[in-house]
């Protein structure tokens, strides 16, 4: 029977619902997928736009109470600014550090849980940690920066901009400038060099401390193997060179209201030792370098008596006759008597007793000629460890290192060896018993034969560790010792002899005196002996009376007056008379001032010799003045440093102060520029602050 189909009563035609739903789902899925791709594409474009275009160029990465650290991503630099961003203390260029993309972000703090720290690992090359610190002073705050390489052979370098900042401190230079913005030196180890041998190096006085006029101070850790370079008027850079030891670059950066306030706080960290005054009797006696170079003790003794008599004949007062190292060795020679017969020995003994009646200074160094009897005896007696040496692998005995000192092959005292130090002190004691000298000048602390020969030094004698140790030896000699180099030793109560200068008007000569005075004083070395009048670098007499007089005028306001050219050999009686006058001025006016402010330095650490910005730390005019200085806050000295001129511009700091010309009594308001002020050849412009 045929099957009868049931009729559909509904007006809607029959459809297969499963198939239709499946097709609908596929359509919606495709639309959603397209929409997702579109959204993802838009988000990607947005992120790229934010990263490249819309992301702020500056990002705060750490904030203190009134200042903070900003990352400037396009220039790859750190900015230290006030929180209101109205003042930039310093800009630090950090370089690429392995990041090829100069626009790479640098805002992810890995120390996010600690609000006083910022940490970041840069391309697995170096790790940066910045910690905020707060000293006792309420208007000073510090940031501790530590760059740590994460692999070997990574150069670390931070460069400090000189734009709108005058920088001070660091190291003495052959041509000293104040501020140091004009310096131009290649990147080199930041150690004290002998500027006579290495005129492009760093010399005499050096500290890992830099002060900026905006109120910023940088103090580099003493353990860092530091290299420093100056790019004139652009920047100076701190660097730790690539090595297998993965040495970090670490320093503390402090900011304050101005340069004076931050220096008063941070400058204390230059030396944690108690401040003690040296023997100030040295202020009262000029030093006269014996102007002869003889080859025998007999001739030397004759010249000593003759020179002493000439000083008396010209009424130049009592002074100290200074002997160089060669002359000292002639008088110290223990074979001196054996060169003569019995009659001559008696005369020599009589002459030495006359020498003891003179005020003399001798010059010694930690160097010993390899041709000397003492050195040969040390080899025979097995005391080679008295000298800086290398250990011999086979025989176990040290091998002394050769170096050069004043044209001779020498060895250098191993100052970390107590037996060697005792031997040296015995040598000084014997010399004092023989000559009765007033002062001992100790040269030769700078340089290291170990590092000069690219050898691995003992840690105790690496870099500038030798100089503080030598200062300790000098202190054991007594307060009659005088040093010629200083680093990390400003607390030692001894005088320091300054760099030798050229006999000209340049910054390597007369113009460099005041910048050097301000540099030494800022770093804590207030008790210094300037170079001889007219300069002593070339060892020749000054033949220009004008140069001699202008030089004389400057040094008469410094702690000790030193002469190499006798005034009677430079010009006529006028030069001798002026020398007498300025010796008297030094005794009657300057020495009491130095004694007064020496006590202030001991208690407050304020320098004796001060830049003009010490009185006006907010006055930008004072930041670059390098031919005026203050003694304390009460005396301003403005010498003439240009050849052939009897006028100069003089700036008087302190808008609320008044200054009186010491020579004519005229009174001027502070904050005033005296243009074309008359200063005769025989005079120095000196102003005394009037009490308010």
Regions found by a protein language model. Name each.
Residues 1-28:
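Short, low-complexity, Lys/Arg-enriched N-terminal segments of secretory-pathway carbohydrate enzymes
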Residues 18-29, 457, 509, 618:
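Juxtamembrane membrane-interface segments at transmembrane-helix boundaries in membrane proteins
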Residues 32-49:
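Hydrophobic membrane-insertion alpha-helices, especially the h-region
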Residues 52-282, 291, 297, 308-310, ...:
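Catalytic and substrate-binding clefts that recognize carbohydrates or anionic sugar/phosphate headgroups
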Residues 74-79, 93, 473-481, 486-500, ...:
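Catalytic core of carbohydrate-active enzymes
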Residues 218-221, 227-230, 262, 331, ...:
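Short helix/loop capping segments that flank catalytic or ligand/cofactor-binding pockets
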Residues 315-583, 615-617:
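Aromatic- and carboxylate-enriched substrate-binding clefts and catalytic-loop regions
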């Amino acid at each position: 029977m045929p099957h009868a189909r049931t009729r559909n009563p509904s007006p809607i035609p029959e459809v297969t619902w499963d198939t239709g739903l499946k097709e609908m789902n596929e359509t919606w899925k495709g639309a959603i997928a397209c929409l997702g791709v579109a959204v993802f594409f838009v988000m990607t474009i947005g992120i790229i736009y934010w990263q490249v275009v819309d992301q702020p160029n500056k990002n705060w990465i750490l904030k203190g109470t009134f200042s903070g650290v900003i990352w400037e991503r396009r220039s790859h630099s750190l900015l230290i600014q006030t929180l209101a961003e109205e003042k930039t203390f310093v800009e630090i260029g950090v370089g690429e550090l392995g990041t090829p993309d100069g626009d790479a972000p640098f805002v992810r703090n890995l120390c996010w849980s600690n609000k006083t720290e910022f940490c970041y690992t840069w391309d697995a090359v170096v790790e940066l940690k910045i910690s905020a610190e707060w000293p006792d002073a309420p208007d000073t705050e510090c940031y501790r920066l530590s760059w740590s390489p994460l692999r070997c052979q990574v150069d670390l370098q931070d460069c400090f901009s000189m734009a709108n900042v005058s920088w001070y401190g660091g190291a003495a230079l052959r041509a000293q400038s104040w501020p140091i913005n004009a310096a131009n030196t290649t990147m080199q180890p930041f150690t004290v060099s002998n500027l006579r041998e290495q005129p492009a190096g760093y010399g005499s006085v050096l500290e890992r401390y830099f002060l900026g006029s905006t109120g910023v101070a940088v103090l580099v850790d003493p353990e860092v193997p530091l290299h420093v370079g100056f790019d004139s008027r652009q920047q100076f850079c701190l660097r730790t060179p690539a090595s297998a030891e993965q040495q970090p670059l670490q320093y503390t950066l402090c900011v304050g209201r101005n340069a004076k306030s931050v220096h008063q706080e941070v400058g204390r960290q230059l030396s944690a030792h108690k401040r003690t005054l040296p023997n100030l009797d040295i202020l009262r006696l000029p030093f006269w370098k014996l102007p002869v170079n003889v080859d025998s003790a007999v001739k030397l003794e004759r010249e000593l008596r003759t020179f002493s008599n000439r000083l008396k004949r010209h009424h130049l007062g009592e002074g100290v006759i200074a002997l160089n190292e060669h002359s000292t060795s002639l008088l110290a020679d223990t074979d001196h008597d054996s060169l003569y017969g019995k009659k001559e020995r008696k005369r020599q003994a009589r002459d030495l007793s006359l020498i003891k009646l003179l005020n003399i200074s001798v010059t010694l160094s930690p160097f010993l000629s390899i041709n000397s009897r003492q050195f040969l005896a040390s080899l025979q007696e097995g005391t080679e460890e008295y000298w800086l040496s290398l250990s011999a692998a086979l025989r176990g005995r040290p091998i002394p290192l050769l170096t050069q000192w004043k044209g001779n092959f020498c060895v250098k005292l191993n100052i970390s060896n107590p037996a060697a130090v005792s031997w040296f002190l015995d040598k000084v004691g014997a010399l004092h018993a023989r000559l009765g000298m007033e002062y001992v000048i100790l040269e030769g602390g700078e340089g290291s034969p170990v590092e000069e020969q690219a050898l691995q030094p003992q840690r105790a004698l690496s870099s500038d560790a030798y100089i503080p140790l030598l200062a300790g030896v000098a202190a054991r000699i007594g307060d009659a010792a005088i040093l010629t180099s200083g680093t990390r030793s400003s607390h030692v109560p001894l005088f320091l002899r300054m760099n030798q200068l050229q006999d000209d008007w340049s910054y390597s000569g007369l113009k460099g005196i005041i910048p050097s005075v301000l540099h030494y004083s800022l770093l804590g070395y207030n008790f210094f002996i300037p170079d001889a009048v007219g300069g002593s670098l070339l060892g020749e007499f000054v033949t220009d009376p004008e140069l001699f007089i202008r030089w004389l005028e400057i040094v008469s306001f410094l702690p000790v007056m030193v002469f190499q050219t006798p005034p009677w050999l430079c010009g006529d009686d006028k030069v001798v008379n002026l020398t007498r006058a300025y010796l008297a001025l030094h005794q009657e006016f300057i020495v009491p001032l130095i004694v007064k402010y020496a006590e202030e330095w001991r208690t407050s650490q304020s320098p004796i010799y001060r830049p003009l910005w010490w009185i006006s730390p907010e006055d930008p005019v004072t930041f670059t003045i390098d031919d005026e200085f203050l003694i304390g806050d009460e005396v301003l000295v403005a010498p003439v440093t240009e050849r052939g001129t009897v006028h100069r511009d003089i700036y008087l700091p302190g808008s609320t102060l008044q200054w009186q010309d010491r020579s004519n009594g005229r009174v001027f308001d502070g904050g005033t520029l005296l243009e074309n002020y008359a200063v005769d050849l025989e005079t120095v412009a000196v102003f005394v602050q009037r009490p308010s």
